[in-house]
């Protein structure tokens, strides 16, 4: 320790004259204290010195070092002291005698006593005795001092939080409390440093001591302490882990008890709480809620011997979200009584009608009967079958829990306008067209709205005047005596009113007919349109017929050869024939022969192209025919599914193709698939497109009508389920009236109002208007086809009863 730290009383900045005065005062006080034998206490800051001479030499050397270090520090910092800062009174030119004396000389006669001596006297043990005569040791009170805590110990190096790396390029490590430099210890040669890094000394930590700058190593005591902590041993050597056990409480027999509290009365009185519990069990036994095991066995044996036939055998099932109770059978009605009222008994006609129906279509599976007495009722023959069906329903039919919703039924009904405000629409039958001997499959009306064409299973095509119902033209295209398998599947007028061409699909042939009912100009224009294409048909190929005959033997094979030319594909799918003389007299101008039966035909809006559908023709199911060039081509190399219907877009070069479960929209100009609609039905029957081209109607054989908005998703916008049987036909009004109608095998026609708004944010408005009935159901077939008048709100229908009807306002 330095001189300043040992003394602890003088400041570096105090003048020397003041120090000398204090020294003289202390010498006087020391002599007075020595005479009175009073002791001067110092806090153990001065250590014992060997001799006064050695102390003076050491003091002189330290003064020299202090002067040298102060001089060097002033030179580095460039500090200059102003002489005016010092007081002139504290300085004198004459030397003083007391300057040569050291502080140790001044306090040499003082007797120093450390705190350890005081504590050893204060902290003494007193020995007394207990009341029983045993020895009692009273130890001194523990004072909470910081003997072992070094958290507030001051560091020798006073650089604070500055890292030692800041002094790497300097010869010193920092400064002590007096501002002196702490010089860096001398380092050995490079070889010594290498050897030290290879042979690490014991206790090496790799750290540097902040106070000295040398390596910080652990002592043997610290290493031993670390070893004990790692091995979970006691770090204090004074603790004996195997000290002998002293029975402090059981070694001596106690004469008096620890507590002499007398026992309470409740220890000797029966418990009231236990009495309540016992009485609760006794009441349960008396009431039968608790049964002894012996009686339980007796009851089980008695129940086994005395079986109750009419007892409820339902096993109690805990209420759980996964436990769904089986629905109970409905109670018997008056019809099932052995003596029902007369109004429940069936007549002979009703019995025959009930017996003629299929068992699945019957409303009830029994006939009501009347007996005079209960003893006359015979055994029920259907009991075994009903029990068997009940068992099948219990373990095969899925169970669903329907949560009841507290919703006002009137709030679910949309607010629709009144049908009276949406007139005109057809409400009654005004004309019936009779003449066909078999069911009428298809009807069509000419663009002018004057002539109605009908095609029937009797093989004839008839044209009627719509206002009077008079038949003006009749042509027999199929001889039923020779060919009774083919039918008139479809027919449609050419949209061009100046041609008067009627396309009729009969079996595998397509007949282009110009009926002689329009006048010379229109009939001549129609024939010229058809005959102008014969020059384009051959392409100069004389062996056309031979190629077609060779291909007829392979018509069941798939024509998927990608190397075939476009002309060969067009010529292979269909063949155009001119009519013979007899067919010309009937008004037939051209015949197109396909490979399979043609089911549907639809014209393009310009009247030059028409598309046909042959569901059994595989990849050539859809054919596009050109009237002006007598060309037939298949737009698809493969048909995905069985094709049911196909139609052109009203004004875009797009083709709508309906299979059994999907509707695909193709762009004919770019030859790509535009969109695929998913109606979500099992079997589509027909489709129709709104005149604006942004909505589509589809009907299905599973009693559904689907409205698709092409601007929305691929799923239906609305699904209408109001028909009881398969829906055969559905049609939009092609004029300016927002109407559409659907026909079904239930013999009903439903008229709807369907407004499509120009605003894309507004959904179409669908309002049911009228239900028309009049056609008879023959062999479970009702109405087969519908067509709207091109200008008026009139509807034409074709039924299986062999009649066509006009429904007007």
Curated annotation (Swiss-Prot):
Keywords assigned: Nucleus, Repeat, Ribosome biogenesis, rRNA processing, WD repeat
Region (Required for interaction with NOP7) residue spans: 267-383
Ranges for region Required for interaction with YTM1: 383-419
Gene Ontology BP annotations: maturation of 5.8S rRNA from tricistronic rRNA transcript (SSU-rRNA, 5.8S rRNA, LSU-rRNA); maturation of LSU-rRNA from tricistronic rRNA transcript (SSU-rRNA, 5.8S rRNA, LSU-rRNA)
Each WD repeat, start to end: 435-474, 483-523, 593-635, 638-676, 679-718, 722-762, 778-809
Domain of life according to the entry: Eukaryota
Localization terms from the record: Nucleus, Nucleolus; Nucleus, Nucleoplasm
Sequence segments annotated as region (Disordered): 1-107, 545-569
Biased composition range(s): Acidic residues: 30-70, 77-97, 553-563
One of the record's GO cellular component terms: preribosome, large subunit precursor
One term of GO molecular function: ribonucleoprotein complex binding
Record SMART domains: BOP1NT, WD40
Pfam families in the record: BOP1NT, WD40
Keyword hit for S-adenosyl-L-methionine: no
Entry keyword annotation includes Nucleus: yes
Complexes and interactors: Component of the NOP7 complex, composed of ERB1, NOP7 and YTM1. The complex is held together by ERB1, which interacts with NOP7 via its N-terminal domain and with YTM1 via a high-affinity interaction between the seven-bladed beta-propeller domains of the 2 proteins. The NOP7 complex associates with the 66S pre-ribosome.
Role played: Component of the NOP7 complex, which is required for maturation of the 25S and 5.8S ribosomal RNAs and formation of the 60S ribosome.
PANTHER family: RIBOSOME BIOGENESIS PROTEIN BOP1, RIBOSOME BIOGENESIS PROTEIN BOP1 BLOCK OF PROLIFERATION 1 PROTEIN
Family: Belongs to the WD repeat BOP1/ERB1 family.
The name this protein goes by in its record: Ribosome biogenesis protein ERB1
Protein species of origin: Scheffersomyces stipitis (strain ATCC 58785 / CBS 6054 / NBRC 10063 / NRRL Y-11545) (Yeast)
Source taxonomy: Eukaryota, Fungi, Dikarya, Ascomycota, Saccharomycotina
